[in-house]
Design a protein with these regions (language model features):
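FAD-site-proximal beta/loop scaffold in flavoenzymes
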Residues: 25, 123-139, 203-251, 255-261, ...
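Short glycine-rich anion-binding loops that position phosphate/pyrophosphate groups of nucleotides
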Residues: 111-114, 205-207
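Beta1-alpha1 glycine-rich phosphate/pyrophosphate-binding loop at the start
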Residues: 5-61, 65, 69, 143-147, ...
Length: 270
């Protein structure tokens, strides 16, 4: 994409909505990378009773309110999974599926990833482990690959890989998968069986922030930030559940506002 946004927000929940509203008020250009609303933890909450100014309502109802407010900011909404964020000479490149977007600053509001990494997943990422079939599939044309994950996206990725000539092993069941190899991953273990493969494509709703952005620091299970919501990577800010406990809605909204103001200050001083 030719356009370089001032800010890209990764995540579409309460912190993201708060950040987007602030960026709009400050006259910045911004895009929001978000999965479908129903994949968020707020959506699944039975009832929210502790948010000031609003009556008790279900998580799904509150998610819809936030999503409409997000749309009303005029943000460019990019539906999909952010796969990586890479610093690039004063800007950042964000990979979403097979597309690429650029921004001067990043705000992480991706919540928390409750799924644990499989053994070998982090070690072999980029060396026989991939989160994106359309990005990396052609590298394994004519070879044997595994697709781990259920749902429509996993099915579409497996179908695509077969269409380009890959021999595809499909794994839809939950359980313990283990990836091993030498310089590159070449073996997938599951349910007591071993499967020689050239690549393992792992399809999840979100990519953990520990895999998303290189160079971040962590403390007590969350991204380490200062009072400005600045991370250890200049130009990258974080807000909401991804910064750690308490995992509260009001905290996420406040941090989203602060992160956006700090991103604006960062951009204005460049």
């Amino acid at each position: 994409m030719d356009q370089i946004y001032d800010v890209i927000i990764i995540g579409g929940g309460a912190a993201a909505t708060s950040a987007a509203m602030t960026l709009k008020n400050r006259g910045k250009t911004f895009a929001v990378v978000a999965n479908k609303a129903e994949t968020g933890s707020l959506y699944k909450a039975e009832k929210i009773t502790n948010y000031p100014g609003l009556p008790p309502m279900s998580g799904a109802e509150m998610t819809e309110l936030f999503r409409q407010q997000l749309i009303d900011t005029g943000a460019t909404i990019i539906e999909g999974r952010a796969l990586s964020v890479l610093p690039m000479e004063g800007t950042f490149g964000v990979a979403v599926g097979s597309d690429y977007y650029m921004a001067g600053s990043i705000i992480l509001t991706a919540g928390i990833t409750r799924e644990k990494l499989y053994p070998g997943e982090a070690e072999y990422l980029g060396r026989g482990v991939s989160y994106c079939a359309t990005c990396d599939g052609m590298l394994y044309r004519g070879k044997t690959v595994a697709v781990v994950g259920g749902g429509e996206e996993a099915k579409q990725d497996a179908d695509f890989l077969e269409s380009i000539g890959c021999s595809v092993l499909r794994f839809e069941k939950n359980g313990r998968y283990e990836i091993s190899g030498g310089m590159k991953a070449n073996l997938l273990k599951f349910a007591g069986e071993e499967y020689p493969v050239d690549c393992v494509f792992i399809i999840k709703d979100t990519v953990s922030v520990t895999q998303l952005v290189p160079g971040l620091s962590y403390e007590n299970g969350g991204i380490l930030v200062d009072r400005r919501m600045a991370t250890a990577v200049p130009g990258v800010f974080a807000a909401g559940d991804c910064t750690g406990k308490p995992l509260q809605l009001a905290k996420a909204v406040g941090e989203g506002n602060v992160a956006a103001l700090s991103a604006c200050d960062y951009l204005d001083k460049k």
